């Protein structure tokens, strides 16, 4: 039984339209994530141990984007990497933590080091552990909380209600993450963005498209569907 038809990035093309823009240099895709910090490039590198450490985070900042330092290391090593990134003078530094174990200790060390965004990094974000973690982090630290991953309007609304400031939308379907294929759960990425953009929430919670983005055209489609930022691990 088909519950409903959904759209993936491959199912969609944007219609070419008339323009009076004289140069691509005139186009701005800049967006805020944390309060007061404008990103010229709405792209975030994924918190994977093969993707984002100091060199990638520094390069992303130089390009106008953001890198999220992965959590698959010791607290001391993750803090050291973040300090190295911040030493370049760019205030934008994000780092991933979990929702169990040492996550509060890790969060404390990272915030003390100057990290402005903590990414609560789990495969299935619509979970009681995520709710507890978001509320604990927000009650203890003055920090932007990026949470996820989710794929439905209801899950987006719940994470926003729990206190998340930005939410990663997308379950699997990426070049590395295979959650959708391994578990049989998920919604095509383009559809997830459309649904979450229509969420009934009372404040500005940023949508981060994550997963299933294979080309620069997919990034454009994600932004057109309502995403504020796009997260990628490879392309």
Regions found by a protein language model. Give the residues of each.
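Alpha/beta enzyme core
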Residues: 3, 12, 51-210, 214-235
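Generic, well-ordered alpha-helical segments
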Residues: 37-40, 48, 52
């Amino acid at each position: 039984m088909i519950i409903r038809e959904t759209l993936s990035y491959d199912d969609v093309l944007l219609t070419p339209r008339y323009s009076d823009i004289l140069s691509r240099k005139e186009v701005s895709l800049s967006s805020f994530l944390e309060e007061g910090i404008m990103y010229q490039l709405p792209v975030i590198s994924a918190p994977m141990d093969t993707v984002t450490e100091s060199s990638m985070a520094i390069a992303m900042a130089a390009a106008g984007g953001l890198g999220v330092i992965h959590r698959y290391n010791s607290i001391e090593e993750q803090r050291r990497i973040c300090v190295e990134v911040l030493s370049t003078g760019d205030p934008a530094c994000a780092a991933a933590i979990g929702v169990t174990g040492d996550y509060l200790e890790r969060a404390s060390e990272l915030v003390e080091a100057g990290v402005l965004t903590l990414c609560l990094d789990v495969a299935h974000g619509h979970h009681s552990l995520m709710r507890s973690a978001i509320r604990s982090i927000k009650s203890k630290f003055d920090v932007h909380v990026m949470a996820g991953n989710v794929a439905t309007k209801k899950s987006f609304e719940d994470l926003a209600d729990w206190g998340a400031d930005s939410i990663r939308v997308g379950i699997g379907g990426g070049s590395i993450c295979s959650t959708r294929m391994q578990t049989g759960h998920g919604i095509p990425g383009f559809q997830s963005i459309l649904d979450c953009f229509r969420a009934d929430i009372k404040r500005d919670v940023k949508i981060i498209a994550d997963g299933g983005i294979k080309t620069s055209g997919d990034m454009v489609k994600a932004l057109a569907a309502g995403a504020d930022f796009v997260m990628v691990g490879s392309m």
